[in-house]
Amino acid sequence: NVETWSNVSAILQKGAQWYASYGTEKSKGTKNFSLVGKVVRTGLIEVPMGITLREIVYDIGGGIPGNKRLKGVQTGGPLGGFIPASLMDLPVDYESLAEAGSIMGSGGMVVMDEDTCMVDVARYFLSFTQSESCGKCVMCRLGTKQMLDILENICNGRGRLEDIDLLLELSEAVKDGSLCALGGTAPNPVLTTIRYFRDEYEEHIKRHHCRAAVCPGLVTAPCSHICPAGIDVPRYIRFIADGKPAEALAVIREKIPFPAVCGLVCFHPCEAKCRRGQLDEAIAIRMLKGY
């Protein structure tokens, strides 16, 4: 590919030993990545093989903006896999990525924070793969469509627990029954999200809960969805804005018999999901409760 050709002139000028001095024993040289997503500094980077994901995300990328929690990194483009935050010390080379369930692929690297739903993002990448299938292989053509339908059902609150095992079974069938690399790697986003984030799948199915509050079939208002008490936060705020504190208090009492206690112990997770925060600052819900 183009990246290989770009290395040829440097190798001819400086020699193979110079190029092999970078990287690991089995993965020599450097690699270009497109670093994007929830990271302070995005852009094209060139790093030696064997550098860790942590070094890329924090030393080069500057970390996660807004003091958010890192959830994982997806490598290899739409056909790659997801690597959780617990594996950020993983060396970036062909062997280590393959062992973790991902690929080097096209050099894409997407950083994801706590506001990313791993079920939804697996659905997103699989929708691309399914649309790109040429249709020659039956398992790729029909298998990815069946997997996409299952993921859409889960994201819309219609999933079943047995769907998780069915996704794993279909993933292996698509990999084994496809002739080209697209079908062979298409299930990677699904396989790795189930491998590392299975609890999110189970939350979607059992509790109809999306912890990132992004799946439209499960979430009406992100602030209410993330509230441990399930309070109708927008209605509560509207009553306060209209000068009706008694009615606002009644909204809390619909879920909690002791609203004063709620005001004292609430750690206001709704503020982290407040859509107003995307414009300027989140509404200070805890201060409103104090009022």
Regions found by a protein language model. Give the residues of each.
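Redox cofactor-anchoring modules in respiratory/redox and cofactor-processing assemblies
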Residues: N1-C215
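Short cysteine clusters
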Residues: C134-C140, C180, C210, C215, ...
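Glycine/serine-rich phosphate-binding loop and adjoining beta1-alpha1 elements at the start
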Residues: H225, A229-P234, R238-Y291
